Amino acid sequence: MGSRSRTPSPSGKRRHHKSKHKKRSKSHHDHERPSTRTDRDKSSEVNNHGRHRERDRDRERDRHRSDRHTERDYRHSPSILKSRKRSSSSSSDSQYSEQESQRSKQKRSRFKKLDEQNQMQVERLAEMERQRRAKELEQKTIEEEAAKRIEMLVKKRVEEELEKRRDEIEQEVNRRVETAKAEMEREMMLELERRREQIREEERRREEDEKQKREELEEILAENNRKIEEAQRKLAEERLAIIEEQRLMDEERQRMRKEQEKRVKEEQKVILGKNNSRPKLSFSLKPGAL
């Protein structure tokens, strides 16, 4: 019994397989849009049927558990143990094997029915999915055909309208061309005027720069002339000072010469006054001697 409780039962495997199938079906239906109201009704009916079958399986599983607990309690109860001790081992083994065989047959029959129901459910879902995809493909084909027809009708209508309004369109195109041409001419005239104004402005700036440079040169020349005149004036003053100094030196030389002559004469007078026997001596100095 312990080993049987640890191994997964076939019903548990089927429930696990069914839950995986239901999850895949649910995620698949979440990502795809139902095409018609009939598909939604069928899917809801299938879901209700699946929930009823799930409840039936839960009831069957609970009943099976209760039978197992009852059997275990029956086998482990003191009175039964005492009676079994009193009974023969062969009879108890045969009864137990018969009960187990009956239970296994019942389980196999139930599992077979569940497998058949699951297979039918899978086939039904596959058929519903096939029908839904066929409807989606048909709807897509219809939409594509309708889009092509609409495109052809629109193209034909546009061509007819263009043919009807060809003269009007040509006049409108010519008008726009003339308008664009006039606008381009106006922009070109404005650009030419702007360039002329720019050239005049550059010429005026160049004249102002030349005038400013000329004035600066004139100022530099005036300053140089003033410096030259100042230098010439200083040079003339220096020359006058040198001439004046030369004149003063000449006057001083004349004065010294006269004083020398006067002193010589006085000395001669003194000498002649002491010695009257000597004749007078005359001394004269040449102008170039000093």
UniProtKB/Swiss-Prot annotation:
Induction: Post-transcriptionally regulated by autoregulatory feedback loop. Splicing is regulated by a stable intronic sequence RNA (sisRNA) resulting from premature cleavage of the pre-mRNA at a cryptic polyadenylation site within intron 2. Premature cleavage is inhibited by the U1-snRNP complex by telescripting. Arglu1 protein stimulates premature cleavage of its own pre-mRNA by binding and inhibiting the activity of the U1-snRNP complex. The modification Phosphoserine is found at S77, S79. Residues 111-269 form a coiled coil. Residues 88-99 have a biased composition (Low complexity). Residues 1-10 have a biased composition (Polar residues). It comes from the Eukaryota. It is found in: Nucleus; Nucleus speckle. GO terms for molecular function: pre-mRNA binding; U1 snRNP binding. One of its GO terms (biological process) is RNA splicing. Keywords: Coiled coil, mRNA processing, mRNA splicing, Nucleus, Phosphoprotein, RNA-binding. One of its GO terms (cellular component) is mitochondrion. Transmembrane segments: none annotated. Residues 12-28 have a biased composition (Basic residues). Residues 29-44, 53-76, 124-137, 249-269 have a biased composition (Basic and acidic residues). Residues 1-137, 193-216, 249-290 are annotated as: Disordered. It holds the Pfam family ARGLU. Belongs to the ARGLU1 family. Associates with the U1-snRNP complex; the interaction is enhanced by binding of Arglu1 to a stable intronic sequence RNA (sisRNA) produced from the Arglu1 gene by premature cleavage. Post-transcriptional regulator of gene expression; modulates splicing and premature cleavage at cryptic polyadenylation sites of its own pre-mRNA through binding and regulation of the U1-snRNP complex. This is Arginine and glutamate-rich protein 1. It comes from Drosophila melanogaster (Fruit fly). The lineage of its organism: Eukaryota, Metazoa, Ecdysozoa, Arthropoda, Hexapoda.
